Amino acid sequence: MSVDPKTLNKQVAKRRTFAIISHPDAGKTTMTEKLLLWGQAIQVAGEVKGRKTDRHATSDWMSMEQERGISITTSVMQFPYKDHIVNLLDTPGHADFSEDTYRTLTAVDSALMMVDGAKGVEERTIKLMEVCRMRDTPIISFVNKLDRQIRDPLELLDEIETVLGIKCVPVTWPIGMGQDFVGVYHLTEDKTYLYKKGHGGEITEIETREGYDYPDVRQRLGELAFSAFEESLELVQMALENFDVDLFLKGEMTPVLFGTALGNFGVNMVLDTLIEHAPPPKSHPTNERIVAADETSFSGFVFKIQANMDPRHRDRIAFLRVCSGKYEKGMKMKHVRLGKDVRISDALTFLAGDREALEEAYPGDIIGLHNHGTISIGDSFTEGEELNFTGIPHFAPELFRRVVLKDPLKSKALQKGLQQLSEEGATQVFMPQINNDLILGAVGVLQFEVVAHRLKEEYKVQCIFEPVSIATVRWIHCDDEAILAKFKKKAHDQLSVDGGGHLTYLAPSRVNLQLMQERYPEVTFSNTREH
């Protein structure tokens, strides 16, 4: 289905696809809620705090997330803002789900980094920034929780620059903090935006004034705090570098805004910055060539699979990032890995757990495809061309458990459940060749809890996890059939097959792995597997 190039260019230019990265509890889910509120996607923001009411945050839609108040899976939300279409991918803030987050960052064109003003740059933010660095992702920064006592803003900027190695250009500067938070001064507009308490869950007109020196502002802050503000503002203005769009697009410079997501203050400025500076959908690499967003032929890749988004339907949805062309309902596309043509007439668009049938989608959009076990993470879909999008990895897990079933009659349901949940990519299943064990691998302990909970809730299977003497796993590859056969014979007791049918080596210790690598230099022991 060809699309008019003019229409396509217009639609591409309107789109912004981004993710929020932060350390747990920096306010990411609250920010997501408020962004949706500004996009008029939800009428009253469901606060994350407390969790005593029935109103859970829109983006935390799975039952375990709602019980525990942590974002575990990546939610996808689309909303309009000022004549643009914004696609927001919410990522898990918990460290155990870094793989899911990593893959999500392959599907976005920019990221919003949230920093807790009281805590500064935290460990998880550093890790996520490393991932963004590898992909030169443009970063917008938001220092959150100004309605509480925060650290000295100059100190925070210095920390972001030194720890994360990215130049900061403040867009706004805070006037006071905590109980005395008055608002922010916009450095390029020479305007003050005044903060009003108690309007966190709604959109209200924000009062603005030219300049910043007003008697009531001085009075609210007190003379001492006001002169401290003036002093820090002067220092910032003296040291301020001009915002360089090229450096921003390379991920080397970040505009910094201050505010409070809970108080819904500064959120619209984030959206305005996103619309003004963040790039529209970019080109994507494949093994064959670079695919540009404005190409008229449809293409896209799957970066995530989610089982049981709707427990009533027992379904699996593959999340596909559109890279070029246009999706139209009922169109025929090629599932490249299988070499098969499929007709897609039931693709979905999302607002977290809510889904709607989709008529059309453009580059930058995320669409949901119903998956009956044939789609894997990393799969490419095109309008016929042999293209394989690259850079969507599987990481070697760091923790392993043997899965023990409480009711042996449920083994079929257990296998199905583990297979489907591992397709999501947060855990991996290994089947040793020596016995009938099922070994589950993950990057963090929380994932085992999540799997046990979801097996019980969604598949009615109860199981326990036992420790197992596996230190690490490596994917095996060897071009020489004779050497591979020799290796398989010698290493038989340590070999297994993963959920995708790939040969793996389960190393009982790091020393053992090293010895095997030395003994078989022609065999590749890889700690990642590209999809």
UniProtKB/Swiss-Prot annotation:
Gene3D superfamilies: P-loop containing nucleotide triphosphate hydrolases, Peptide chain release factor 3, domain III. The keyword Oxidoreductase does not apply. Disulfide bonds: none annotated. It is found in: Cytoplasm. Residues 13-282 form the tr-type G domain. GTP binds at residues 22-29, 90-94, 144-147. Keywords: Cytoplasm, GTP-binding, Nucleotide-binding, Protein biosynthesis. Pfam families: EF-G_D2, GTP_EFTU, RF3_C. Transmembrane segments: none annotated. One of its GO terms (cellular component) is cytosol. One of its GO terms (biological process) is regulation of translational termination. SUPFAM superfamilies: EF-G C-terminal domain-like, P-loop containing nucleoside triphosphate hydrolases, Translation proteins. The keyword Cytoplasm applies. GO terms for molecular function: GTP binding; GTPase activity; guanosine tetraphosphate binding; translation release factor activity, codon nonspecific; translation release factor activity, codon specific. It comes from the Bacteria. Increases the formation of ribosomal termination complexes and stimulates activities of RF-1 and RF-2. It binds guanine nucleotides and has strong preference for UGA stop codons. It may interact directly with the ribosome. The stimulation of RF-1 and RF-2 is significantly reduced by GTP and GDP, but not by GMP. Belongs to the TRAFAC class translation factor GTPase superfamily. Classic translation factor GTPase family. PrfC subfamily. PANTHER family: PEPTIDE CHAIN RELEASE FACTOR RF3. This is Peptide chain release factor 3.
